[in-house]
Structures are given as C-alpha cells and as structure tokens.
C-alpha cells in the first residue's frame, strides 16, 4: 500500500471531523472570549494543531475532546493576554478598543459579558455546559477537575448570574 493510500482515509476523516465540529467549537470559544474574530482564531489554531497530529488523534476515543481542550486552553491564554494588555493600556491612560459586533439576540451579549466576568473556571464550566452541552463528567475532563467540583462551579456561577440578572430586572422595572 502506498503512502498516499494510507493517508487518504485520515485526511477524509479529518475533513469530515472539521466540518462536523467547527461551528460548535466556535460557539464555545465565543462564549469564553466574547469576540467572533478571536473565537475563530482560537478554533482555527486548535484545528491546525489537530490536523498536524491527526494520525495520532484520530485513534483517540474522543478526538473532539482533544480539540475542545485545546480551544479552552487557547481561549484562556487569550484572556490572560487581554488582561495584561488592558492593564498596560489603563496604566498609560488610554482607552481600549476591543469591541466586536456579534450576531446575538438582544440581551445575549450582556448575559455573556456577565458570564465572562465570573471567575475563570465558573465561566468555562458555564460555557461548556450550556454551549457545548457537555455532561459534568465531560466538563471535569476538560477542566481537569472532578464532577463535584464542576457542580460547585456551575452552582456558584448560576447564583452570581441570578443576582446580577435580578438587579437588571429591578433597574428595568
């Protein structure tokens, strides 16, 4: 069997995997980052890394889980960089210019802004649960913690969001 014959199924497998998972991964990254451009960059980097290692990753029980983990890790890196840049810009007395116009229903951007304002693990747990529809066990695998810890993150995040959303209703009503 030639090299081309052995790699062709792997390439076709990656292409199908990419087409099937790309949108879902972008939604997850967007939930974590709040920017469509940044989300697409992170997801493209994750899929590029997966493509380079596809002969190995294709044999994993959960290739999607591998890509998801890379997306979450890279999104976390972007957020750390943004925080450092934000601090530097504010030390200089300048205004930041990080605004994007996402295609969301009215009010959704504000809700996700509040999610991103949560502690990092809580925001990640919320995004993985509500955007990527993962179980507590799966989220624990992505975040490297137990399902019980995931439950705690989700509970605390929901409490904070409930308080914030209740204050919105009081202000509006």
Can you name each region flagged by the protein language model?
Residues 41-48, 61-73:
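Structural recognition of an alpha-helix C-terminal capping motif at a helix-to-coil junction
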């Amino acid at each position: 069997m030639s090299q081309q014959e052995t790699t062709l199924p792997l390439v076709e497998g990656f292409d199908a995997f990419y087409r099937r998972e790309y949108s879902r991964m972008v939604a997850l990254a967007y939930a974590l980052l709040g920017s469509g451009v940044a989300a697409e960059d992170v997801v493209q980097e994750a899929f590029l890394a997966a493509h380079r290692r596809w002969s190995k990753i294709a044999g994993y029980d959960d290739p999607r889980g591998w890509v998801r983990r890379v997306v979450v890790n890279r999104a976390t890196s972007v957020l750390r960089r943004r925080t450092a840049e934000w601090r530097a810009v504010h030390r200089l007395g300048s205004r930041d210019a990080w605004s994007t116009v996402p295609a969301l229903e009215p009010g959704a951007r504000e809700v996700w802004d509040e999610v991103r304002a949560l502690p990092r693990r809580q925001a990640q747990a919320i995004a993985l649960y509500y955007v990527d529809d993962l179980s507590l066990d799966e989220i624990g695998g992505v975040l490297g913690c137990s399902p019980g810890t995931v439950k705690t993150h989700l509970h605390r995040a929901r409490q904070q969001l409930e308080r914030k959303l209740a204050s919105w209703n009081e202000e509006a009503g």
